[in-house]
């Protein structure tokens, strides 16, 4: 299969590199229908939009054509060109990712020729845009004079450019088809290689499964028992460690509570001492005043009792 692939690529590249002699073209009136472009890939559809837009410009009347060429046609063709080349590049990169391992020399040659075909297509589209821009400049230069000669020259140039564009687009299409075939073949080889590598592993897995199935129920039960016992012992150890950790935390809390109780007791005693130091002098002073008052009352009563008998005599 690999030999057929290499032969196909070499044959196609040799045919694409052959010199193509330009054929004389029949005179075609401006605006006459010319073949469209069809394809299913995104880049082919983008090129078809460029092709259809250029054909639509060709079918316009002279006055409308001149007005459009002076404003929007060049810009819209530029957008369509960029879109086409972007899709071509994306499709080529996608194929390069899918391309399997082939001969290094053949792969490099295919890639080089494909890039050259892509560059020729871009050059053809750029020539179309440049020719339309030149026609617009020449129309503006004649300042209202007859433009029949200019339109004739434009039609002749566009016929040649259309033919070259179609030829290079078909060339690129063929090369991408070859590239695509190589990518599919590479994918198939990759799947086969993976299958070959997985085969021994699958056989080994089936053999291991058979070995496990042949073990006695007692051996498997013993294995599960050992595993379960180890798990229970592990859980018991974890539980003991957790309980020890809780006990240590409770001891720390109790020590902190006792420490805080001692601090509160010391603070209460200090506060009591401060209260005593505040009120003790006041109490002593009140006691002295009370003793003096009692003494004065007693003295007054004694004086009153001695003076009363004297008055009776």
From Swiss-Prot:
Renumbered residue ranges of the record's region Lipid-binding and lipoprotein association: 209-286
This protein's UniProt keywords: Chylomicron, Endosome, Extracellular matrix, HDL, Heparin-binding, Lipid transport, Lipid-binding, Phosphoprotein, Repeat, Secreted, Signal, Transport, VLDL
Residues in the signal sequence: 1-18
Residues the record lists as binding heparin: 161-164, 225-232
Listed InterPro entries: ApoA_E, Apolipoprotein_A1/A4/E
Pfam family, one: Apolipoprotein
Region (LDL and other lipoprotein receptors binding) residue spans: 157-167
Mapped Sequence repeat ranges: 79-100, 101-122, 123-144, 145-166, 167-188, 189-209, 210-229, 230-251
Region annotation (Specificity for association with VLDL) ranges: 274-286
SUPFAM superfamilies with a match to the protein in the record: Apolipoprotein A-I
Mod. after translation: APOE exists as multiple glycosylated and sialylated glycoforms within cells and in plasma. The extent of glycosylation and sialylation are tissue and context specific. Glycated in plasma VLDL.
GO terms assigned for molecular function: cholesterol transfer activity; heparan sulfate proteoglycan binding; heparin binding; identical protein binding; low-density lipoprotein particle receptor binding; phosphatidylcholine-sterol O-acyltransferase activator activity; phospholipid binding
Subcellular location: Secreted; Secreted, Extracellular space; Secreted, Extracellular space, Extracellular matrix; Extracellular vesicle
A biological-process GO annotation: triglyceride-rich lipoprotein particle clearance
GO cellular component: chylomicron; extracellular exosome; extracellular matrix; extracellular space; high-density lipoprotein particle; intermediate-density lipoprotein particle; low-density lipoprotein particle; multivesicular body, internal vesicle
Disulfide bonds listed in the record: none
Residue numbers spanned by region Homooligomerization: 262-313
Task of the protein: APOE is an apolipoprotein, a protein associating with lipid particles, that mainly functions in lipoprotein-mediated lipid transport between organs via the plasma and interstitial fluids. APOE is a core component of plasma lipoproteins and is involved in their production, conversion and clearance. Apolipoproteins are amphipathic molecules that interact both with lipids of the lipoprotein particle core and the aqueous environment of the plasma.
Assembly and interaction partners: Homotetramer. May interact with ABCA1; functionally associated with ABCA1 in the biogenesis of HDLs. May interact with APP/A4 amyloid-beta peptide; the interaction is extremely stable in vitro but its physiological significance is unclear. May interact with MAPT. May interact with MAP2. In the cerebrospinal fluid, interacts with secreted SORL1. Interacts with PMEL; this allows the loading of PMEL luminal fragment on ILVs to induce fibril nucleation.
Recorded family membership: Belongs to the apolipoprotein A1/A4/E family.
Protein name listed in UniProt: Apolipoprotein E
């Amino acid at each position: 299969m690999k030999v057929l692939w290499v032969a196909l690529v070499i044959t196609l590249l040799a045919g694409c590199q052959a010199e193509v002699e330009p054929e004389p073209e029949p005179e075609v009136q401006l605006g006459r229908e010319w073949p469209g472009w069809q394809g299913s890939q995104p880049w082919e559809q983008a090129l078809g939009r460029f092709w259809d837009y250029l054909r639509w410009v060709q079918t316009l009347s002279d006055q409308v054509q001149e007005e459009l060429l002076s404003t929007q046609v060049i810009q819209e063709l530029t957008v369509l060109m960029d879109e086409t080349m972007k899709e071509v590049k994306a499709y080529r990169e996608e194929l390069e990712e899918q391309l399997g391992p082939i001969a290094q020399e053949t792969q490099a040659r295919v890639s080089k020729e494909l890039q050259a075909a892509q560059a020729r297509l871009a050059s053809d589209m750029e020539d179309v845009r440049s020719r339309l821009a030149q026609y617009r400049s020449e129309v503006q230069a004649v300042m209202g004079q007859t433009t029949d000669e200019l339109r004739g020259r434009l039609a002749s140039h566009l016929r040649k450019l259309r033919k070259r564009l179609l030829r290079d687009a078909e060339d690129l299409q063929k090369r991408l088809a070859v590239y695509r075939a190589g990518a599919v073949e590479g994918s198939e080889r990759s799947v086969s290689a993976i299958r070959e590598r997985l085969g021994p592993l699958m056989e080994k897995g089936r053999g291991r499964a058979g070995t496990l199935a042949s073990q006695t129920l007692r051996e498997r039960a013993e294995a599960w028992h050992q595993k379960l016992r180890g798990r229970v012992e592990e859980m018991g150890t974890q539980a003991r460690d957790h309980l020890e950790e809780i006990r240590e935390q409770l001891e720390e809390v109790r020590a902190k509570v006792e420490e805080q109780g001692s601090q509160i007791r010391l603070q209460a005693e200090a506060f009591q001492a401060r209260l005593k130091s505040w009120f003790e002098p006041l109490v002593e002073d009140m006691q002295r005043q009370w003793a003096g008052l009692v003494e004065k009352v007693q003295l007054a009563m004694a004086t009153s009792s001695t003076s009363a008998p004297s008055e009776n005599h």
